[in-house]
Amino acid sequence: MKIIGIIQARTGSKRLKNKVLLKLGDRCILEILLERLKKSKKLDDIIVATTIKKEDNAIVELCNSLGVNVFRGSEKDVLDRFYNASKFYSGDVIVRITGDNPLTSIELIDKQVEYLLKNNFDYVSTKNIILGLSSEVFTFDALEKAWKNAKEKYQREHVTPYIYENPNLFKVFYLEPPEYLKREGIRLTIDTIKDFKLYLELQKHFDLINVDIRQIIDFLDKNPQIKNINSNVRQKSYREVEE
């Protein structure tokens, strides 16, 4: 049983170009995420899945310099990229992580993997938590079925909708999140320049590789002027696709 974390990352985001390579202190966003993921007790391997586009050579070079496995695939059909990366690296269970969420909860990753394995679920995630902390866990078999059957553009771009939209075909489970993560009004994903500015403020006060999420939440509650930097950023629906 091999459990792999796959980080989807590219430089061509429309709202914030090169975002995963932007520096927070002496490390870029993707590097901070990679370092944090090393704390997981469940992941056997971590792979960065980027695109075949020339502009993403920089991501490949970074991964090579860090000794991190990398896979290149379709830019728009991210489901195909995940399927082929999982197949290439022989993953039985896959954790989907996005490269613009450097503070992805390691606690939740490990709990989700545990629940999936103990209960023979096909898919496990966590709803209603601070944006930027979540991940998804699913079996290779579920991924393969989605890869074969998903037809809609958004299902191909966002990887997992075909799975969780079909609970009659898959055993889908959502963990109850810890109370401290059930918060509205805090946004910790990096999608826009405002999101990045908030992280620049956090970086002044914390070691982002080792900080506990509770410290971040407490800090933002005590500093609403920082918390509100990105409060008016619109979060896109998973059914929206980039043309």
Swiss-Prot record:
Gene3D superfamilies: Spore Coat Polysaccharide Biosynthesis Protein SpsA, Chain A (3.90.550.10). CDD domains: GT2_SpsF (cd02518). It holds the Pfam family CTP_transf_3. One of its GO terms (cellular component) is cytosol. Disulfide bonds: none annotated. It comes from the Archaea. PANTHER family: 3-DEOXY-MANNO-OCTULOSONATE CYTIDYLYLTRANSFERASE, SPORE COAT POLYSACCHARIDE BIOSYNTHESIS PROTEIN SPSF. This is Uncharacterized protein MJ1063. It comes from Methanocaldococcus jannaschii (strain ATCC 43067 / DSM 2661 / JAL-1 / JCM 10045 / NBRC 100440).
